[in-house]
């Protein structure tokens, strides 16, 4: 469900990459992250390898009507950027998709797009290797710490 790899392009930020590693170690799953200094070079190489490029922008086509036409049998790179996205991205992208035509949160746009692409959100999905497991509860927090459970059973 969702993304399996994150590429931070442009300025290197070890804090962002470290946070992604920490979240994966805590909540499980198979997720990797890397930095790439040249976004256009990365995307050109990705496209040459047969990947599809989806650019989330407020200037693109409506995401609800366009997303179902995106093939999911090949890798997909989702470009999420702010005001400084180079104009060439619009030409490189196989799809320029708008989650609304007003300024919006890039994180929210990514979440909505992935939900539409993947056919909804799996609310109770548990990732393998999780240290913490969050259980749904109507009036509070229920978190199981699998490390504490294994420590107390010894």
Feature locations, PLM:
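Short internal beta-strands
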Residues: 4-12
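Well-ordered beta-strand positions
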Residues: 5, 52, 94-95
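Conserved beta-strand segments of the P-loop GTPase G domain that flank and frequently precede/overlap
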Residues: 8-9, 55-57, 99-100
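Gly/Ser/Thr-rich loops at beta-strand to alpha-helix junctions
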Residues: 11-14, 103-105
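S-adenosyl-L-methionine/SAH cofactor-binding core of RNA-modifying enzymes
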Residues: 17-85
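Structured adenosyl-cofactor binding patch, chiefly the S-adenosyl-L-methionine
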Residues: 90-128, 132-138
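Long, charged alpha-helical interface segments
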Residues: 138-154
